[in-house]
Amino acid sequence: MDQEKVIVIDFGGQYNQLVARRVRECNVYCEIYSYKIDIEKIKEMNPKGIILTGGPNSCYEENSPSYRKELFELGIPVLGICYGAQLMMHKLGGKVITPEVGEYGKTEITYSANGVMFKDLPSESVCWMSHFDRIAEAAPGFEVVAHTADCPIAATQNVEKKLYAVQFHPEVLHTKNGTQMIYNFVRGVCGCAGTWKMDSFVKNTIDEIREQVGDGKVLLALSGGVDSSVLAALLAKAIGKQLTCVFVDHGLLRKNEGDEVEGVFGKDGSFDINFVRVNAQERYYSKLAGVTEPERKRKIIGEEFIRVFEEEAKKIGKVDFLAQGTIYPDVVESGLGGESAVIKSHHNVGGLPEHVDFKDIVEPLRNLFKDEVRKVGLELGLPDYLVFRQPFPGPGLGIRIIGEVTAEKVRIVQDADWIYRSEVEKAAKEYKEAHGEEPSWMPNQYFAALTNMRSVGVMGDERTYDYAVAVRAVRTVDFMTAEAAEIPFEVLQTVMSRIINEVKGVNRVFYDLTSKPPGTIEFE
């Protein structure tokens, strides 16, 4: 992309993607690179600014991630965060030490009026610390502009050389006014104009798709999730009938989800594309019969999806391009971007159907974060219920049903989940109408799951022996950690009452209070 950008050099920090997201919130394009990136490539890119991330190492130890001193002599503004700040000081003649105790969590901090990154911010505030080593002496030419009780040099700067170092993490929400600090760096120090906006992205990307595809045919496996739905809408705007979307309904979707997807992209929808819906429910239920082990269920569901998709692709005939809803975290987490990111092999990076004949792939969303994908969806006119869908696992309800998957169990969890989500959304809407803001308890993800447990109950004058449903709701910033949401008790009572009275086969409802860790958000 030929545009102004800031690059993030990753030294193994857990917040590398968060740094890039905060930069993009300032309407500045940003990419993540490993600390192994060659300095000649940086010169070639000529970024408006460079940000060095945190990391788990000590900068003065042998074999620790490092970078050439030349980086700080390019004349490009550099911001070092935590490990990145220590590395900057270490390379430029400062001193970094390992004290007896580290500094972790929310910390009171004092900013100097001279601090360029703290312009117009209160002098006394709170920041997020997560370090053991610390800067003991600033490098020559640097001015100390922030301190805490245990960290005398919490921030330092060399305004003339446009070099800035902060020991805390401005990218984390716990740092008050942290986003403004990053704004002051990228828009102030770096001089970025802030032209990275989704309306211009859509326009430019449509042109790029048309140039890449020409008059070729494109095939997309449409799951109905946010990424694939936005991708379908974007491709539809660009190439219309040259796009064929295959939607495999495996019977493990949320209630009414299949019909919602068809309503948007099918013949009665607003997009002029070729839409194929494959109703494969019985095929999946047959394959899953008797299977209880979670990973085995995942594998069956994934493999069967590829088989069904390949069968439909053969019916369509030759296609030129396969479209994938790869987004930027997929690229980073697959080790193709930053250093800390070799976490898992993502299904959209390196996993392609073997028996579909195509010459290239189309991945127009691969540079976007999830929140940006949603903005593109709104820009393209997709309905809110598609754009703001909650995260949903690839195996669908197959891993929200503990034990064997059957048609009856799918019906139970679909109905219970629909009731639960409806009541939470209703309560949140009523609160917002009354108070003018979203309730503090509003979860980021909430769903029902079916336990593999039956229990004795009494309904009317009869004894029952039915399933127990568990409902889960979590609040989280990054889905890496999560806490149980404190949904009002009266809302949970309503949910319990409705599920037991309206969903046949259920006589007990549990509310899951487990945080992540030790639990995971999903049950399997």
Swiss-Prot record:
It catalyses: XMP + L-glutamine + ATP + H2O = GMP + L-glutamate + AMP + diphosphate + 2 H(+). GO terms for cellular component: cytosol. GO terms for molecular function: ATP binding; GMP synthase activity. Keywords: ATP-binding, Glutamine amidotransferase, GMP biosynthesis, Ligase, Nucleotide-binding, Purine biosynthesis. Pathway: Purine metabolism; GMP biosynthesis; GMP from XMP (L-Gln route): step 1/1. It comes from the Bacteria. The keyword RNA-binding does not apply. Its EC number is 6.3.5.2. The keyword Nucleotide-binding applies. InterPro entries: Class_I_gatase-like, GATASE, GMP_synth_C, GMP_synth_GATase, GMP_synthase, GMPS_ATP_PPase_dom, NAD/GMP_synthase, Rossmann-like_a/b/a_fold. ATP binds at S223, G224, G225, V226, D227, S228, S229. It is an enzyme of class 6 (ligase). The active site is at C82 (nucleophile), H169, E171. Residues 5-195 form the Glutamine amidotransferase type-1 domain. Gene3D superfamilies: 3.30.300.10, 3.40.50.880, HUPs. Residues 196-389 form the GMPS ATP-PPase domain. It holds the Pfam family GATase. PANTHER family: GMP SYNTHASE [GLUTAMINE-HYDROLYZING] (PTHR11922:SF2), GMP SYNTHASE-RELATED (PTHR11922). NCBIfam families: guaA_Cterm, guaA_Nterm, PRK00074.1. Homodimer. Catalyzes the synthesis of GMP from XMP. This is GMP synthase [glutamine-hydrolyzing]. The gene is guaA.
